[in-house]
Amino acid sequence: MSFALGQRWISDTESDLGLGTVVAVDDRTVSVLFAASEENRLYAKHDAPITRVTFNKGDTIESHEGWSLEVEDVIEDGGLLTYIGTRTDTDEVNVVLRETLLSHQIRFNKPQDKLFAGQIDRMDRFALRFRALQNQYEQHKNPMRGLCGMRAGLIPHQLFIAHEVGRRYAPRVLLADEVGLGKTIEAGMIIHQQVLSGRAERVLIVVPETLQHQWLVEMMRRFNLHFSIFDEERCIESYADSENPFDTAQLVLCSLDFIRRSKRRFEQVVEADWDLLVVDEAHHLEWNQTKPSRAYQVIEAIAEETAGVLLLTATPEQLGHESHFARLRLLDPDRFYDYDAFVEEERQYQPVADAVTALMSGDKLSNDAKNRIAELLSEQDVEPLFRIIESDGSEEQQSQVRQELVDNLMDRHGTGRVLFRNTRAAIKGFPQRNLNLMPMALPPQYATSMRVATMMGGRMSNEARAMKMLYPEEIFQEFEGDSATWWQFDPRVNWLLELLKENRNEKVLIIASRASTALQLEQALREREGIRGTVFHEGMSIIERDKAAAYFAQEEGGAQVLICSEIGSEGRNFQFANQLVMFDLPFNPDLLEQRIGRLDRIGQKRDIDIHVPYLQGTSQELLARWFDEGLNAFGETCPTGRAVYEKFSDTIIAILATGKSDGLEPLIEESAALNKELKAQLEQGRDRLLEVHSNGGNKAKELAEKIAATDGDIHLVNFALNLFDTIGLNQDDKGENAIVVTPAENMLVSSYPGLPYEGCTITFDRKTALSREDMNLISWEHPMIQGGIDLVLTEGVGATAVSLLKNKALPAGTLLLELIYVVDAQAPKKSGIGRFLPKTPIRLMMDSKGNDLSAQVEFESFNRQLSPVNRHMASKLVNSVQKEIHALIDTAEVSIEDRIEAVRVDANAEMKTALNGELDRLQALKAVNPNIRDEELTQIETQMSELSAYIGKAQVQLDSLRLIVVSHN
């Protein structure tokens, strides 16, 4: 090393000191002043851990006055360098800048600058960086992205729907799985995919007030999505940050009532720019052609301004056929433009169902089937497709063609891509329902009060009287006052106490229609037998309800009984219990199904006992018999219940209003016959279509198997532990697939993404995570991994390295240069660029003659043959071959151009294939539905041309490099 006063050097071991200046030199030592950090260092001359900073032609450097110079020439005189070039701010040419006047705070951003400046990292960090780039790329390209990292069981039909919908641009769908099939999880998976891919950045979830907290917790626990609940208080607090409070958070959760009640809040929600709207319990959105409900109008206004919309309802035709059409109209007003046309189209489902069944069966297509398909797809030339099906070609190709025809049929002639509905009949693994009808004698106190109420209720409508007669305890209280203790003589209470005593170790869910009944029942159980119970009703706050639900769920020391009013049977799930008591009966079959669905859902491991105590000779007995014998609504799910009820509602109400069984037998017979007929119709037409479309068949099973195969990925485990080590996190193995991760004092950063201040317990095993709520399931999608990768890449970890290759087959001193380039298209995340051209790493391995050996030398196996070099020695090695490294980088820059072009071509082809498919679909739809807007077609064409331009302008940047020197020692 030769030193001269004024030379600029950088410390190999303390790179944060900035750029140093030689201020004193004697025979044995050199003194360097680091002005940026106001530090002085004295080094031994012969082995100083510092590196001379030199810049080259093409570099941009900064003067201590703040202006920059693009270097065109470098002159050395008396050991000092002078840079000549053009000022970037004034374009003045031939400007001279002596190295002494360089900025003290100079930063080396290019990996080659860092390498030459002695900022050399460890080789294990270089390997970590390359793996981070590779994994980031693979995750972006993974078609199952957003599905693998959720903390939920791998249930095929849920995965299929989420996969089908989640990868669409601006999905607009109605998720209408039957009660208990997991719509909330499906919605969460769709949101997760949309957010991860950048297709949705701002998401609004609108739910009934009672379900806000449940959604908040589900999104956070299962998907690591942190929503904010917005109410009046939160909106007022947010005014300091924005005029529109809904602009202050990206992921927002609020109740429908909240935005329906306030005109101002409603307008603010509509004005906020959402990418995705999710509405739960969408069957509350009533509509008819003359007068839509306020709730419907509110959601319609938001849906018109929002690209993606998910509506969730357990009962697609609940509240009538018109409301079902209206919900579909919210999603796709072009496809569902006229109610009468919709009704007419539904009548034509049968031939479509037959054609789909023929295609799905895999059997040879009959001429009739072919003619039917050709007629239904008249705008498409299907003959070539039939020829492929009948040829001796590969099974895979035939299967693809059959699937293409099925997709086209369903898209154009059914509710297609808009409605997904799975039924229990199609999903295996549900428990049996065991019904226990318990007739009981009517107490004289009730008989008297009911008789008097009948005499006094002369002006009451039949419906109001029928409703009243179902709840004798309420009638009794009206006469006796609030202090009346009906539960002292009601035989249902005595029976219930005995049931609970006999089943002390069972959790029992009790549902009553009224909140007052639920509260008094809890009091009776507590006072008479000291039974631990908790109540759940509409008068409680969300937090109080959550506490009640948690107390019931608690295994040790928890409540034996949870008593819910009717609202308790919407949205809350208690599949850990299998005992359901209906203290009274709801007025319609849909509510009955909702009640049973709290226990009878996916995840229920045992058969369900449904206990229905009723008072003989009252409306309760008549309704129980009609539900049981007319609909079999207790024994199995009843999708036809609403239609049967509407057909016979006048008769049912008249019978319930009198409380007499005259006319009950014929009503039961006619109801059972109609129910059977409707079920047969559903079996024939639309439901079979939807079943084929919604449960995914073998595709769904394959999807679940693929995701299961990625669980516990050993590459992920190794990468995560290596990442945590590099960042400086403490890891404590707790056994049973669990590791406790906590922040450490000497971390690379002050706080680690996704890691709480107090640390957390992690597992890589899905089964363990599902059984232990206190654990984080770590996957490639988890914020601790995603955030860690971002941290490594932005903090420059592993951007340079020097390694030794001990190989006597090569001459000692042979050089290899490993370069990692990244292809990056600068485009908005929403454009979908990440799907076709995410940041793409390209590895080159240049030998000393400028040949690229990367195809012959695989990274991991080569990395295992290398040995590390300490930083000081590495810096010396780099300095001794600086000229050769420059030459190899220049050669690599030429080689990389061909590789970039190939990446651009592949990305463009993939994008055009995907988007042309969508364009063709809309053009075909336009042929059968003139209401498809031209803008929709131009939107896709515009998107294709924009993406094509972004891909064409994709640039490459050298991200990291490693010098490898052959050694024989």
UniProtKB/Swiss-Prot annotation:
Classification of source organism: Bacteria, Pseudomonadati, Pseudomonadota, Gammaproteobacteria, Vibrionales
Residues engaged in binding ATP: 177-184
Family, per entry: Belongs to the SNF2/RAD54 helicase family. RapA subfamily.
Protein name: RNA polymerase-associated protein RapA
Ranges where the Helicase C-terminal domain occurs: 492-672
Domain of life per record: Bacteria
Assembly notes: Interacts with the RNAP. Has a higher affinity for the core RNAP than for the holoenzyme. Its ATPase activity is stimulated by binding to RNAP.
Gene: rapA
Stored Pfam families: Helicase_C (PF00271), RapA_C (PF12137), SNF2-rel_dom (PF00176), Tudor_1_RapA (PF18339), Tudor_RapA (PF18337)
Record's keyword terms, sorted: Activator, ATP-binding, DNA-binding, Helicase, Hydrolase, Nucleotide-binding, Transcription, Transcription regulation
GO biological process: regulation of DNA-templated transcription
An example molecular function term from Gene Ontology annotations: DNA binding
InterPro entries, alphabetized: Helicase_ATP-bd, Helicase_C-like, Helicase_RapA, P-loop_NTPase, RapA_C, SNF2-like_sf, SNF2/RAD54-like_C, SNF2_N
Coiled-coil annotated residue ranges, if any: none
Role of this protein: Transcription regulator that activates transcription by stimulating RNA polymerase (RNAP) recycling in case of stress conditions such as supercoiled DNA or high salt concentrations. Probably acts by releasing the RNAP, when it is trapped or immobilized on tightly supercoiled DNA. Does not activate transcription on linear DNA. Probably not involved in DNA repair.
